[in-house]
Amino acid sequence: MYFEQKNIFSAFVGILGTRALDSVSVYEKNRQTDLAQTRFPDLIRRGSGERPSPNDCLESKASIRPWAVQAHYNHEGWYIIWRYLIDKTMSIEAEKPVIVWRVDVVYLKSADWKYEGSGAGPGGGGRTHTFGVDKPAAKLKGKALYKRTDLTVKNGKPVPKNHK
């Protein structure tokens, strides 16, 4: 699937994360499907009611990038970011072409986001507007809930520590 539609694969990984958290955590999938599918949040703390506070909201994101966090909105709340890599040769782990190598959990306020604009316009294509976390490496420092110890970031990509 990744090689056919790279642009939607991160959404797919984020959806799998949402489903996993719904089944094993204090968070449940947002039952308001129009919000969950297009806006915010993906998950809400069980029992938090129809209008949860930002502290009860959890958005599931996935990225192949080691630091960037992007969203279509700059909502305040909790974010879980599944950092994954594609290993076509399956040399890191046999039979595993997709590896989640780090999971970041961070509370972000609206002010933590910066507007990144859009190339979309009447003349043709382009992305819809997005927001990115300002200074993501600094904001995510120490926020890894899970991190593989056999990988490191080199030249902006996760690689095996013994990689030359």
What are these regions (language model features)?
Residues 1-40, 44-56, 62-164:
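Nucleic-acid endonuclease domains
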